[in-house]
Each structure stands twice: as C-alpha cells, then as structure tokens.
C-alpha cells in the first residue's frame, strides 16, 4: 500500500460508540524501525479519540473472562497482561433501548464494557487480541482465536480459517478449526494434514495447535461478511447444520 502512496490508519469502534473511538497515530520515528516492528506498531488500535476519555484496559473475572467485572482494576501497561477494553466519553451510547438488564451489564462499574480483550502497551496504545467470548483457555493458557486463524491461513492451501473452543478433559478447552481451501485445492487437503503441518512445520506454538480441523465448502457469515462464530460453536457441539 505504501508503494501506491497509500497510508493505512488503524481505527477501532463499536455500534455503541457511533463509529471509531480509537486511532493508531503514526509516529515519524517508526520509519527508522525494522519493518516487522514498524508494521506491528501500525497494527495496534492506538489511542482514544479527543472526543472521549482515555481508553482503558481492565482485568476480567479470572473464572469467566466473558463476564465483565465491575471492579475496573487496570492491567499493567506491559503489552502482555490481557484485559477488557472499557470506554467513557461523549461518543458512548447512553443505554440499550428498553433493555435495562443489558444496559446494566454494558456499564458495569460506570464504564462501557466492549467485550474485546486486549493488551496495553507502555506508550498507552491498545492492541486487541480477541473477543472475550472467543478466547480459548487451554491448560491455563489464553489462546487468541484471531491469532491462531492468522497463523493457519499461512498454509499455502488454506483460504480462510475460524477457530472455536471445544471441551477437553485434560486441558479444559482446545481449539477446533474450521477452514476453507483455495480454488483448485478442493478435496486435496484433510484436517489431519493441517494438524500435522501445524505441529511440525508451521511455527505455531504447541499449545495452540488445533485438536480438530474440519474442511468446509464455505464458512457461515453475516450479510456483511462477518464470521458467525456462534454457529460454528454450535456445530462444534454437534448442532444441526442448516445454515
């Protein structure tokens, strides 16, 4: 994109914030960094809008990261500790229409809970790892489904990947991956081959390797192209496949 004189900017927002509420502000000294480090910083969701209070990341409930905590204890700004993004400011919605219980949960502790898990870097920039409900907790390790999907699509034959948690007696949860293959590769790649590649030739950490991989003709998506992981979670449990 830069070769075409295009300068990508990373923004982040929700329906409840009327659009973008953070922006990745480019720093000139980033041009002096190694390419991987430069683009890694550009990929962060950045800092809060001038129309909002500073974006914060707070600890989630240890036993249930999908359940927001009202204590609002901030995580360390070390780029490692994972927490939930919370927001305050004029861009935030007031309430859910005629839904007081959803409103109460959204604003638990006096801040808007996004349901997005992220880390907080020393310079104040945030970096999203996953949705709270999509994180896979395996043997005490937090596996970002987004990160695992990004690694799986580096396989030369995989077009798309979507990962969900499945129960595991030993580890609590393990990843299951649903994939589609590139044109011309239909019927030539099995789930077992993908698992073998992930274990031995991909560079994927062992604890992240999917326990199961299923090849689909297409992944279920909304009309806007968003993955319907709720359906994939149901399929992983043996639910009806009528979508």
Give a label for each model feature.
Residues 1-11, 15-125, 132-135, 148, ...:
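Conserved AMP-binding/adenylate-forming
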Residues 4, 51-53, 110, 156-159, ...:
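Structural motif
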Residues 21, 175, 211-212, 230:
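Extracytoplasmic/periplasmic beta-strand context in beta-sandwich domains
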Residues 203-226:
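AMP-binding/adenylate-forming catalytic domain of the ANL superfamily
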Residues 236-243:
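Acidic/polar alpha-helix N-cap and adjacent early helical turns
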Residues 89, 94-95, 104-105, 117-206, ...:
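AMP-binding/adenylate-forming catalytic core of the ANL superfamily
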Residues 61-63, 168, 217-221:
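Short, internal active-site loops enriched in acidic
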Residues 8, 55, 161-163, 213-215:
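Generic structural signal for residues in well-ordered beta-strands
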């Amino acid at each position: 994109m830069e070769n075409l004189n295009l300068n990508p900017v990373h923004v982040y927002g929700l329906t409840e914030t009327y659009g973008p509420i953070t922006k990745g502000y480019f720093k000139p000294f980033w041009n002096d960094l190694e390419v991987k480090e430069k683009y890694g910083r550009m990929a962060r969701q950045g800092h809060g809008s001038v129309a909002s209070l500073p974006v914060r990341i707070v600890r989630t409930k240890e036993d249930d990261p999908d359940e927001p905590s009202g204590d609002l204890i901030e995580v360390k700004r070390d780029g490692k500790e994972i927490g939930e993004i919370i927001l305050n400011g004029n861009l935030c919605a007031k309430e859910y229409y005629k839904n007081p219980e959803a409103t109460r949960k959204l604003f638990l502790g006096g801040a808007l809970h996004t349901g997005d898990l992220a880390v907080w870097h020393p310079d104040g920039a945030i970096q999203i790892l996953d949705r709270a409900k999509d994180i896979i907790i395996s043997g005490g390790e937090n596996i970002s489904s987004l990160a695992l999907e990004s690694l799986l699509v580096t396989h030369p034959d995989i077009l798309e990947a979507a990962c969900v948690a499945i129960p595991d007696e030993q580890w609590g949860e393990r990843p299951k991956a649903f994939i589609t293959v590139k044109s011309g590769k239909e019927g030539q790649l099995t789930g077992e081959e993908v698992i073998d590649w992930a274990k031995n030739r991909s560079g994927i950490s062992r604890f992240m390797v999917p326990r199961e991989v299923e090849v689909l003709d297409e992944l279920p998506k909304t009309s806007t192209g968003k993955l319907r992981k709720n359906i994939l979670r149901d399929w992983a449990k043996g639910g009806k496949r009528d979508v």
